[in-house]
Amino acid sequence: MSVKIGNIDVGDFPLLLAPMEDVSDPPFRALCKEYGADVMYTEFISSEGLIRDAVKSTQKLDIYDSERPIGIQIFGNEISSMKQATEICAREKPEIIDINYGCPVKKVANKGAGAGILKDIPKMISMTKEIVKSTDIPVTVKTRLGWDEHTKYIVEVAERLQDVGIKAISIHGRTRKQMYKGEADWTLIGEVKNNPRMKIPVFGNGDIDSPQKVKEVKNKYGVDGVMIGRGAIGYPWIFNEIKHFLKTNELLKKPNIKERVDVCRRHLKHSIIWKGEMTGIAEMKRHYSSYFKAIPNFKEYRTKMVTANSEDEVLRILDDVLLNFSNY
């Protein structure tokens, strides 16, 4: 049965690309869409940055028809600023406005934004209510289980967020205190999904790195779909691999070296076009190890790629990879 976020049909058991800072930009989103992602989210955008018209924030508003349905994700700690940012985002006509209540990094959380708001649930609910009231676009939330082990209130929080009008919730199976350490705990995500009061889609997130893992959480916890973050970095093929496995119970063959090099090269070129050579090359570095994961004796080439400082240099290294690893 198709899942709907408000009036947006996102298909049966949709796969969502997580909003990731300096990762979920248009070049990477285009690849993920090509390889099977159903719903895109922008990198998270500072509400204050949007209001100030800061270039770093406004550039993240760039969305394209080819990647729809797409959500623009915002974060902040002031209700008035978040409402104003929502109005700015609405001009770009995204299908979804997503609120980040999950970012655990200190510079965000210590200001009471992102996962920081998990220490002030009444404010979280009030902020969400005001954002929902300020737009006709479906509003969704991405959050965590709680601030720490003693404040895992996600079952109640999800109900209250639904009551003020959100149209879907994505839950990362860790607390803010955990950051990304340890294993994601999906049991509470399952409790939210199986709470008879919950009527909106519940998407799970955390440690989704294989088709087998997706099948496990789908069957065990009944989630409406999954949001994939780190598992997609440098590996956009994961979306089609998951879809194929859920449909056939068979694993797709991993991309060969030519496919990996071709997609990596395209990703690099689009990143440079979009962000300029220096930034494009710098932000590609986090992708290289995953593009060429599990290839023996690759360390030398990976080191060369992450230390390269020009497009021509990286492209020459990729040519060498294609030549020297043609059997993979």
PLM region spans:
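Flavin-dependent oxidoreductase catalytic cores
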Residues: 1-328
